């Protein structure tokens, strides 16, 4: 996925007058430079302010949010931030990244961090997951949306969960 895809989704949300749009940022640091995430976040925040739609709710490094080797303890940390509002806290996404960089943790390894607790994923929400790589998206998708998930203890959520591609034939 690319930030332009996210901007397109935010623009569509504005056109459709969607309220309460929250972004859960998965930081990269591998396919782009390891410390470039802060510039992407600044660009995103500027765009959201410009169009008047969207707020960053959480940040997580791909090490946690996009695991692909059934390391559920990592995925659980990202899930807990996005759904339960638990984990590291920061007043802003930029502050969270600056703290991570200060601790010598690049974008890939940003600890799941809650920036806006109002953005927790909850029953009745719609989630648009716009990552195009199925291998990196399956586990967090299962944790959030799979009715028979058993990777760690969590409650089943009643969501509309939409992806940009099929991650796995067993996922609905």
Where are these regions (language model features)?
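…; additionally, a secondary subgroup of soluble metalloenzymes is captured
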Residues: 1-172
């Amino acid at each position: 996925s690319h930030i332009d895809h996210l901007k397109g989704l935010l623009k569509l949300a504005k056109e459709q007058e969607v309220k309460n749009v929250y972004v859960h940022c998965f930081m990269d640091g591998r396919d782009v430079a390891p410390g470039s995430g802060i510039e992407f976040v600044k660009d995103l925040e500027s765009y959201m302010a410009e169009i008047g739609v969207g707020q960053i709710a959480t940040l997580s490094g791909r090490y946690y949010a996009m695991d692909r080797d059934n390391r559920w303890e990592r995925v659980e940390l990202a899930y807990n931030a996005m759904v339960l509002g638990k984990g590291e806290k920061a007043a802003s996404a930029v502050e969270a990244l600056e703290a991570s960089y200060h601790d010598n943790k690049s974008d890939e390894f940003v600890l799941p961090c809650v920036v806006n607790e109002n953005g927790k994923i909850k029953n009745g929400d719609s989630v648009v997951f716009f990552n195009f790589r199925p291998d990196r998206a399956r586990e967090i998708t299962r944790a959030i949306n799979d009715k028979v998930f058993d990777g760690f203890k969590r409650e089943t959520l009643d969501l509309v969960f939409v992806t940009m591609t099929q991650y796995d034939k067993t996922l609905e």
